């Protein structure tokens, strides 16, 4: 792998079972593309997952499932480093150092903790959830990542990463690369099929608006055909006045590579039913092979385990070197063997 490429790192939680269309179009698809231009490190972040209670058997199964889906989506272990976060203990070790450099007020200002703890109740939220962004800092700095692909909602965490890298470097000497946010350009924002005013998410009030990539293709087609639209009949993109139709056009355009103006022209004089029927077919053509590829990896656990073991080995080679340097700079007494 060309070491002169900028290094990029990102991760996905293993808590949801099936990826949904928003995950795929909003992040995973871009990860696949970044393999071509970057030295890419991708991980299933199971340490982050346990910041809220998890059933151990489900966590284990969902970690394997997330890895299988990433491979099915097009991540190539020959062109990127794919691993499970807990297979690289240096993440937790560096996180402790970063915790000790982070101000309490600084951590308190992280909006994601406020949002998540508000849902759980502050008394029930774990310290792990509170320091979640600091573990994310360690994830990034361990690999000396130049860029971190993020959506706008994660920008605050990248600012914390930059602050802590500069703080450590200023106090102990140049150690960490100060990363830049790689804001995912042209990321399709996919909305709920039943309520196009909210982002597609597992936490929606009804599963009818959510396209899970591992659902039966017939169920996926039915959800598309049942998508909420408006009382008009003209198919055109207008996110403010026609959010439902605009969402369907975005999905269609993103999956097929057809421009929205081209789609508007194609459906001139046709009703919403025609668009929904065609999009349902596009979705089925997409999810069917994705499901099959995911299942192939799940049916061959030895190959999946081997890919993850090799990925962890490659990741640890980088992480151990960074941690060793950080330990030395902080002043820890080296262990003699």
From Swiss-Prot:
One of its GO terms (biological process) is tryptophanyl-tRNA aminoacylation. Its EC number is 6.1.1.2. A motif ('HIGH' region) lies at residues 14-23. One of its GO terms (molecular function) is ATP binding. L-tryptophan binds at residue 139. It is found in: Cytoplasm. Its main location: cytoplasm. It is an enzyme of class 6 (ligase). Disulfide bonds: none annotated. ATP binds at residues 13-15, 22-23, 151-153, 190, 199-203. This is Tryptophan--tRNA ligase 2. Catalyzes the attachment of tryptophan to tRNA(Trp). Belongs to the class-I aminoacyl-tRNA synthetase family. A motif ('KMSKS' region) lies at residues 199-203. The keyword Acyltransferase does not apply. NCBIfam families: trpS (TIGR00233). One of its GO terms (cellular component) is cytosol. Homodimer. Keywords: Aminoacyl-tRNA synthetase, ATP-binding, Cytoplasm, Ligase, Nucleotide-binding, Protein biosynthesis. The keyword Membrane does not apply. It catalyses: tRNA(Trp) + L-tryptophan + ATP = L-tryptophyl-tRNA(Trp) + AMP + diphosphate + H(+). Pfam families: tRNA-synt_1b (PF00579). It comes from the Bacteria.
């Amino acid at each position: 792998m060309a070491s002169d490429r900028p290094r990029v790192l990102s991760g996905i939680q293993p808590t949801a079972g099936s990826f949904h269309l928003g995950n795929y179009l909003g992040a995973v698809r871009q990860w696949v593309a970044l393999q071509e231009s970057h030295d890419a490190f991708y991980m299933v972040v199971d340490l982050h997952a346990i910041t809220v209670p998890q059933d151990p058997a489900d966590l284990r199964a969902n970690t394997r499932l997330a890895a299988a889906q990433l491979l099915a989506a097009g991540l190539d272990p020959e062109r990127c480093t794919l691993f499970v976060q807990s297979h690289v203990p240096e993440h937790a070790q560096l996180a402790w150092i970063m915790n000790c450099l982070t101000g309490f007020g600084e951590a308190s200002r992280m909006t994601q903790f406020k949002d998540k703890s508000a849902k759980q109740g502050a008394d029930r939220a774990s310290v792990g959830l509170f320091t979640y962004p600091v573990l994310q800092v360690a994830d990034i700095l361990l690999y000396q990542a130049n860029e971190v692909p993020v959506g706008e909602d994660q920008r605050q965490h990248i600012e914390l990463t930059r602050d802590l890298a500069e703080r450590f470097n200023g106090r102990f000497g140049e150690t960490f690369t100060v990363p830049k946010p790689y804001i995912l350009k042209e990321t399709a924002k996919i909305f709920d099929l039943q309520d196009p005013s909210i982002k597609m998410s597992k936490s929606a009030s009804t599963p009818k608006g959510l396209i899970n990539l591992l659902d039966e293709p017939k169920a996926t087609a039915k959800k598309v055909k049942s998508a909420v639209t408006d009382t008009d009949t003209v198919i055109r993109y207008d996110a403010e006045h026609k959010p439902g139709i605009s969402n369907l056009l975005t999905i269609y355009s993103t999956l097929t590579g057809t421009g929205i103006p081209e789609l508007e022209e194609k459906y001139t004089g046709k009703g919403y039913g025609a668009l929904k029927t065609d999009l349902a077919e596009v979705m089925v053509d997409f999810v069917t092979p994705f499901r099959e590829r995911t299942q192939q990896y799940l049916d061959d656990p030895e190959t999946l385990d081997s890919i993850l073991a090799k990925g962890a080995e490659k990741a640890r080679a980088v992480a151990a070197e960074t941690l060793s340097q950080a330990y030395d700079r902080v002043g820890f007494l080296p262990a003699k063997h």
